[in-house]
């Protein structure tokens, strides 16, 4: 008997359109598997309302929400649409960024007592905040590019002190980032003190916490991991960016003549670098209590070969240009089997959690 699977995508997020592309790829894989009754749920970008679809269309085809039934969640009872309990067995969230990767949807589904693909509340929340994630990883001796972080309130209290710290602790150039956003949105490189203030103001449009890192000339290496307590770490890949300073949103999703981005899978690494990257990926996945899947991103400094962990994506992209699935495929795990495995991990994690909180026995 087929399980009922809800595929959630869209969201009130700057990464809304990427989520729709990821969902379409996963939807096609689910159709190919023919193991699940698929209930696609679209979250409106402006209102956050959940709508039930018949299918997932190939983006960027617009979705007319005026004629769609609304989805309602009733804890203890189920997920409803058109006054009918959909009896959902598992949810596959593909909402990138806020409310999707920050533990919000994961928390809702935990309250609903429904298995959820991917990381749980804690792993999602920590991984989504670059500043707090870096502080935690630093305590586990994971190598990081030198950084400082601060809240908007701190910046307005003593702007000059923060600018002085940037100059003395990091030195220019630096990268200015909002703490909570994916796809490198809102990121700028400041080459001098004249630029830093405007770039901080730009980043504050996206988040109240800011991270500033020392800018280094580095190779960008990515590593896919799947599994729960037992995990599989795939051969890392490299993103070679030709027409951009770094792999930002425009580099990832803009169409540039001349093929401006090259994906090297597997990445060309020294044996010791490969082993170190896999070890740091393993320690990160374990210490952040991640499960299901993650893409762990690294820098390898071009001059010294030093490895630094950059960030973690708990719901990586599943578009046709996304590295996560490409790295899995390179090691022999095809896309539809990857999707199937991720769903299995969700059921396994749910069963293990229920064993620990069974109040009846």
From Swiss-Prot:
NCBIfam families: D_ala_D_alaTIGR (TIGR01205), PRK01966.1-4 (NF002528), PRK14570.1 (NF011168). ATP binds at residues 167-222. Its EC number is 6.3.2.4. The keyword Cell wall biogenesis/degradation applies. Belongs to the D-alanine--D-alanine ligase family. It catalyses: 2 D-alanine + ATP = D-alanyl-D-alanine + ADP + phosphate + H(+). Binds 2 magnesium or manganese ions per subunit. One of its GO terms (molecular function) is D-alanine-D-alanine ligase activity. Mg(2+) 2 binds at residues 311, 313. The keyword rRNA-binding does not apply. It comes from Borreliella burgdorferi (strain ATCC 35210 / DSM 4680 / CIP 102532 / B31). Pfam families: Dala_Dala_lig_C (PF07478), Dala_Dala_lig_N (PF01820). Keywords: ATP-binding, Cell shape, Cell wall biogenesis/degradation, Cytoplasm, Ligase, Magnesium, Manganese, Metal-binding, Nucleotide-binding, Peptidoglycan synthesis. Residues 134-344 form the ATP-grasp domain. One of its GO terms (cellular component) is cytosol. Cell wall formation. Pathway: Cell wall biogenesis; peptidoglycan biosynthesis. Mg(2+) 1 binds at residues 297, 311. This is D-alanine--D-alanine ligase. Its cofactor is Mg(2+); Mn(2+). It is found in: Cytoplasm. Its main location: cytoplasm. GO terms for biological process: cell wall organization; peptidoglycan biosynthetic process; regulation of cell shape.
